[in-house]
From Swiss-Prot:
NCBIfam families: xseA
InterPro entries: Exonuc_VII_L, Exonuc_VII_lsu_C, OB-fold_nuc-bd_dom
Organism domain of life: Bacteria
Name of this protein: Exodeoxyribonuclease 7 large subunit
Organism whose genome encodes this protein: Pseudomonas entomophila (strain L48)
GO molecular function terms noted in the UniProt entry: exodeoxyribonuclease VII activity; nucleic acid binding
């Protein structure tokens, strides 16, 4: 504890400037209040483009400026707004430029009912997104239940109010209490177990009930485990938690929400006097309908009696009809047989026309004809091919180089066996081969002018 901060900072004799004073005050505050928790209500919330947040934290008697810088503001899960009760943590500092005393925050969280409200809205949004509140899941309540399970505290006014309503309106209904705590942390698991056990008992409907209280008192009915246990039940459930203004997550998940436990009992307890009046009305309507039906049937019987004939006459008519049917059946049978005989004859004629022996005979005749024509055709083809060959042979002999040689000409070949067609292809002294009709001569070029080449035989 600082007994004399002025003496510690040497301020008893020294004259300071304003900047020096504010600077030393900031050091003193930050040294003493390094991390403190403060609870209050947000007001004058500002969000500049920098991402920082500035607001005033106040209670009924005082206020203090607060700064929440961007890196810490990003970690705040809930949306801040004016009027929100929060619990903040930070260090006490002083803005030297204005001499303002302020809190530099690193943590902001909802306080008291504010935290519970935010948790309520978060769970409501989560379960709603999963479809647990959809009307398609809601089951209708039985019109005339016989056995009902009541999940609530065994003591208190709630169970007495429910029993009183059933005794007055439907004393014939069997009521079964499944006792459980309805407040505190232990109540959560007890309610879940009670729901699971009641759902296995084959009740026509269940009532989940609790009397009024604060938000914290009713909080166990806003827990996710309880909500999912309600949703998992096969038995229709009426949720009656708190007073008419109280709303819980269980109310949204249940098949029906009742504003009070007594109202839940009235939903499931058919009014005996009303039922008796309805039964009387139905009895009168049934009697009138029976009388009308009897009168109608009496008239119908009288009409049938007038139309009724002696059994012997009816038997004779039936015998005559039977004889007529017998004759028609015989004629139909004979006609059918004749038609079948005619069809069989047509099929026999078609089958004979398609007999394989006839086809084979025609094919044999064609084969014999082809066998007779084949030798002559082959001779004609050979004769034609022979004549064409002779003509082509004569043409070949006319254009053959050998025929030219036979007429006294020769062919000159160079040393590579290539034919000499021009004097320009030779040179003086070149050795050539002269191919004749019969044999070859070795010659040498004496003169290769464009005039006729002079050759001489080689020795």
């Amino acid at each position: 504890m600082i007994k004399d901060p002025f003496e510690r900072l040497g301020l008893d004799r020294e004259v300071l400037t304003v900047s020096q004073l504010n600077g030393r005050a900031r050091v003193l505050l930050e040294d003493v209040f390094r991390s403190v928790w403060v609870e209050g209500e947000i007001s004058n919330l500002a969000r500049p483009a920098s991402g920082h947040m500035y607001f005033t934290l106040k209670d009924s008697g005082a206020q203090i400026r607060c700064a929440l810088f961007r890196q810490n503001a990003l970690r705040v899960r809930q949306a801040l707004r004016d009027g929100l009760a929060v619990r903040v943590r930070g260090k006490v500092s002083l803005f030297e430029g204005r001499g303002d005393y302020q809190l530099i925050l690193d943590t902001v969280e909802p306080a008291g009912d504010g935290a519970l409200r935010l948790a309520f809205e978060a769970l409501k949004e989560k379960l709603g997104a999963e479809g647990l509140f959809s009307t398609e899941r809601k089951r209708p309540l039985p019109a005339h239940p016989q056995r009902i399970g009541i999940i609530t505290s065994p003591t208190g006014a709630v169970i007495r109010d429910i029993i009183s309503v059933f005794r007055r309106r439907a004393p014939q209904v069997e009521l079964n209490l499944i006792p459980t705590a309805v407040q505190g942390r232990e109540a959560i698991n007890q309610i879940v177990r009670a729901l699971q056990m009641a759902d296995r008992q084959g009740f026509d409907a269940l009532i989940l009930a609790r009397g009024g209280g604060s938000l914290e008192d009713l909080w166990c009915f806003n827990e996710e485990a309880v909500a999912r246990a309600v949703a998992a039940c096969v038995t229709p459930i009426v949720s009656a938690v708190g007073h008419e203004t109280d709303v819980s997550i269980s109310d949204f998940v249940a098949d029906v929400r009742a504003p009070t436990p007594s109202a839940a009992a009235e939903l499931l307890a058919p009014d005996s006097s009303g039922l008796q009046q309805r039964l009387d009305s139905l009895q009168r309507r049934l009697l009138l309908r029976m009388q009308s039906r009897l009168a109608h049937d009496r008239l119908r019987v009288e009409g049938l009696a007038r139309r009724l004939r002696h059994p012997g006459e009816r038997l004779r008519q039936q015998a005559q009809r039977l004889d007529d049917l017998d004759m028609r059946l015989r004629r139909a049978f004979a006609l059918n047989m004749n038609q079948r005989h005619e069809r069989l004859g047509r099929l026999d004629t078609r089958l004979a026309a398609q007999h394989p022996g006839r086809s084979l005979k025609l094919l044999k005749q064609r084969l014999d004809s082809l066998a007779e024509r084949l030798p002559k055709a082959m001779r004609d083809v050979l004769k034609d091919r022979r004549q064409r060959f002779q003509a082509q042979l004569q043409t070949l002999q006319v254009v053959s180089p050998l025929a030219t040689l036979a007429r006294g000409y020769s062919i000159l070949l160079d040393e590579h066996g290539q034919a000499i067609r021009s004097a320009a292809q030779t040179h003086n002294g070149q050795r050539l081969t002269a191919r004749l009709n019969e044999g070859e001569l070795k010659v040498r070029v004496e003169d290769n002018h464009q005039t006729p080449v002079t050759l001489s035989l080689l020795d």
